[in-house]
């Protein structure tokens, strides 16, 4: 799915670009994703569990960019990818109106408005694509994420207890949210 690039002013005054990733972004995007996995327990993996090669990521990006049911966006600041967001609709006809949302931002860029801007762009694109429902999960305790989701009209519809077990044995629930478009 296509995405038209846009520039946004961050809360710190810097300019960020939201754009579709390119296959040549594979290494930088992998680096960003792996960094995000290491900076927070609010994502699904540890960095050592993410072993995609640059070639595999480039192939994935090529397929994703050609997909009519998937949208990927990266956020670039000063030439560096610092976040990514996506939605993936299901190909099953009975559920083709729904899409799953994912979002991650490097910790140094939290609180600057990137999450809100990327999620707003996803909501607008999903609406334009004819989708009528976006869904996401977040790990309990992710108050920053929850604030963005609430602000953009997502509502809680359930909880998956004991969904995440951290290395120290701590158990966390996933909170399930939905937005009707």
Indicate where each model-derived feature is located:
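Conserved catalytic-core motifs of GNAT/GCN5-like acyltransferases
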Residues: 135-138, 150, 155-170
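Active-site acidic-Proline motif in GNAT/NAT acetyltransferases
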Residues: 103-108, 112, 140-141
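Conserved G/P- and acidic residue-centered "switch" motifs that form tight phosphate/ATP-binding loops
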Residues: 25, 79, 113
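Helix-loop element at the rim of GNAT/NAT acetyltransferase active sites that forms part
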Residues: 31-48
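Acetyl-CoA-dependent GNAT
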Residues: 37, 49-98, 102-106, 119-120, ...
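Short acidic N-proximal helix/loop "leader" segments that mark the beginning
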Residues: 1-12
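Conserved GNAT acetyl-CoA-binding A-motif
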Residues: 119, 126-137
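A short beta-loop-alpha structural element at the N-terminal edge
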Residues: 16-31
